[in-house]
């Protein structure tokens, strides 16, 4: 399937599909805690993003990681005026909420694809079964990684703010 066919079909589809080198891959539904964690990030960051002229997406807008790859992150921010109406090409911040069905891809192929995006400053993986977050930070031309468990915080440079694990996991029951 061509990129053009994929984008056209995805525009009218009730099911989300990621696109990897000519193949459309259906996205599975997730548990309520997964959705709650993604929505929590929206509540924390959307107003600030709006004030800074940035845009927040949650689960329903694609990120183009290569010419032939489109992924659906759980949460992303872009401050680029040049993004296409159908997808982000220049996100500065991406979050994936981990689940049994996505963890391997989130730590594997998506990690590789996302960290190749020149605009990306942070890639954050949020556990949905415990208070645990992995933060990948762009430091010049290299990436560093930090694991946060129970407490801690990470910065979101493009929004000039920090997020704590307490904010993300407030009232979340495992």
Predicted regions and their residues:
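Gly/Pro/Ser/Thr-rich low-complexity, intrinsically disordered segments predominantly at protein N-termini
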Residues: 1-174
